[in-house]
Curated annotation (Swiss-Prot):
InterPro entries tied to this protein: ATP_synth_asu-like_sf (IPR023366), Lumazine-bd (IPR001783), Lumazine-bd_dom (IPR026017), Riboflavin_synthase-like_b-brl (IPR017938)
Gene that this sequence comes from: ribE
Residues the record lists as binding 2,4-dihydroxypteridine 1: 4-6, 145-147, 159-164
EC number assigned by the record: 2.5.1.9
Keywords, alphabetical: Repeat, Riboflavin biosynthesis, Transferase
Subunit organization: Homotrimer.
Lumazine-binding repeats mapped onto the chain: 1-97, 98-194
Listed transmembrane segments: none
Binding-site list for 2,4-dihydroxypteridine 2: 48-50, 62-67, 101-103, 136
Organism, as annotated: Photobacterium leiognathi
Biological classification of the source: Bacteria, Pseudomonadati, Pseudomonadota, Gammaproteobacteria, Vibrionales
Protein's recorded name: Riboflavin synthase
Length: 218
């Protein structure tokens, strides 16, 4: 689990293609990985990756073809800047919101405008995700915990404050940029609960109708 508070900006040092999957080398720059072990998780641009090898300059992680195709990683090249966050500890202050590192879809930056020292960006997200997004709700973009300012169909407006701009790769934002999108897990759990409640209610109603039809109740 992660918080969506970025600890460092790294970059992709190498992409190694195997028969059925890939490995990437991530240069961590100023991220302290002295407490990271092989098998630990690091959110890399919002994707939860498992460290397979530790290097003097960073780490190596494996990507399945599924992860490669379903995230913005398919558009990355060597040198691509990536937001980095180590897995949270029980003692970690939750400054953002709970983030799983399981990307729900790939969005695209369609517009951005300066707003004083901040920046407003508009991101088009996959249509199937729009039902999970609400004004003042949370969303994770490339691993960054952000608050949604407005929702227009499947487009969300976000304001990036100066500190977030300085500490993440959003400082180099551009039109058509592909971004990893993870919805707030609470929204997905709420949908599941509603579906279960609706199913149980319909099932109970159908049973009552059958009992009434056969004269067991009136």
């Amino acid at each position: 689990m992660f918080t969506g508070i970025i600890e460092s900006i790294g970059n992709i040092g190498a992409i190694i293609r195997h028969n059925e999957d890939l490995s990437i080398v991530v240069n961590t720059n100023n991220l302290d990985i002295s407490d990271v072990n092989i098998g630990d998780s690091i959110a890399t641009n919002g994707v939860c990756l498992t460290v397979s090898k530790l290097l003097p300059s960073g780490y190596t992680a494996d990507l399945s073809l599924e992860t490669y195709k379903r995230t913005a990683f398919h558009s990355y090249r060597i040198g691509q800047e990536v937001n980095l966050e180590k897995a949270m500890l029980p003692t970690t202050r939750l400054g953002g919101h709970l983030v799983s590192g399981h990307v729900d879809g790939v969005g695209e930056v369609i517009e951005f405008k300066r707003n004083g020292r901040a920046i407003n960006i508009w991101v088009a997200v996959p249509v199937q995700l729009k039902k999970y997004l609400s004004e003042k709700g949370s969303v994770t973009i490339d691993g960054i915990s952000l608050t949604i300012n407005a929702v227009y169909q499947n487009v969300i407006k976000l304001t990036i404050v100066p500190h977030t701009l300085a500490e993440t790769n959003l400082v180099n934002i551009n039109i058509d940029k592909k971004v990893n999108v993870e919805i707030d897990m609470m929204a997905r759990y709420l949908e599941k609960l509603i579906k279960v409640d609706r199913y149980e209610s319909e099932k109970t109603s159908n049973v009552s109708m059958d009992l009434e039809r056969y004269g067991f109740i009136s």
